Every structure is written in C-alpha cells, then in structure tokens.
Amino acid sequence: MWALTVFVTILAAAIPITGVTGVCEDMAGNGRAPGEVWTEDSCTLYECGEDDSGELNTLFVAGCPLSLEIPKGCHYEPRSGNFPYCCPLLVCPDYVDKKNVRRRI
C-alpha cells in the first residue's frame, strides 16, 4: 500500500487587536507577533506575518483538505497530533512482490 498526506494553504486576513499594532489575533483572542507560528485544535497551522506594505497583519493558514476524490480501492485513515500529522492519511493498495506495503509519498 502507499500512503499520501495532502494539505492545502489558504491565505486569510487577520484582524489586529484594537489599539495594538504589530500583532495578529488568534481564535482565542490572544495576540501573536509577526513570524510566530502555532497550531489550533482544528488541525490547522497558523503564522502571523505582515503584508507587502508592512502595515497590516496577515494570518497565513495551512490545513488539511476538506475532501478529495478518493481513487478506487483507497481509503482515508484518521490520525492525531499537531499539524500536519493530524491530517488524514490516504492509503492505497500497492502490489509490490505480491505484498501489501505502506509507503508515504
């Protein structure tokens, strides 16, 4: 068998905390400094950064795909841990020497 973990990157604007410059606000309302990276319970990786003008803070988000077309004979296996290890693992049969093996690509 072979296995594949896929994640996508999405850009989303973050709202700076009122009265505070140079910070992004996480989902819990905590201030995050530019360049700071953290994960949330939703299996998502966040990074606080500045846009090209240097004035606005931008939250760069990477997360697991919501859905992908699953090839015939394949299935997703749930996983746990911090991003990206919490993303489901796509497992497919791979017939090598008539054995089923798992391979991460």
Swiss-Prot record:
Q: What is a single Pfam family found in this protein's UniProt entry?
A: SVWC
Keywords, comma-separated and alphabetical: Disulfide bond, Secreted, Signal, Toxin
* Gene Ontology molecular functions: toxin activity
Q: In which tissues is it expressed?
A: Expressed by the venom gland.
As for subcellular location, the record says: Secreted
Which residues constitute the signal peptide according to the record? 1-22
Q: List the disulfide bonds.
A: none
Determine the domain of life of the protein's source: Eukaryota
Record GO cellular component, one term: extracellular region
How is the protein modified post-translationally, according to the record? Contains 4 disulfide bonds.
Q: Which family does it belong to?
A: Belongs to the scoloptoxin-16 family.
Q: By what name is this protein known?
A: U-scoloptoxin(16)-Sm4a
